[in-house]
Amino acid sequence: DLREVFNALRWLVRAGAPWRMLPNDLPPWEAVYQQSRRWLDAGCFEAMVSDLRSIIRVAQGRQGQPSAVVMDGRTLQSSCESGPRAGYDGYKRKRGSKVHMAVDTLGHLLAVHVTPADEQERAQVHKLCEAVQQATGHSVQWAWADQGYTGEAASKAAQGNGIDLQIVKLPEAKKGFVLLPRRWVVERS
């Protein structure tokens, strides 16, 4: 039964357990693994997330697909085992990976790209914009980002995907933490 296979997959994700540790009241781990690979290869989970995102947006009185996104990157500290995959982020003073993400204005995840921490945010604009347009059916027209995305190359990369990149800057007289307009939704994601 596919429902039991799906329940087993949900249990694995929730428990963080290896395949072979599935409880005996669920289907055999081999069957669950094979079916989950089929679902992953067919893009079932991406389609499910896209449909749910559209339903939530319509329920909140918005269009099904977003017209604007917010982009940001965050550095995640790595462990010793990550080896050469980890880079050093001089600004955050951390060794690890950098997660670049794009969310819609409600905070729903649209695209994720992981790089070593020493990669610049502005260099990832093309891949993020490409993934966003693919996920939304080319409905996105605007993107807001922080000052890590400044530069002509980043702007051209976004324009090449039909997106107008707008940088939200920190007010000049302010010091310390300042809540920037349109940027807070990505910080909570």
Tell where the protein language model's regions lie, with residue ranges.
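Short alpha-helical elements
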Residues: 1-189
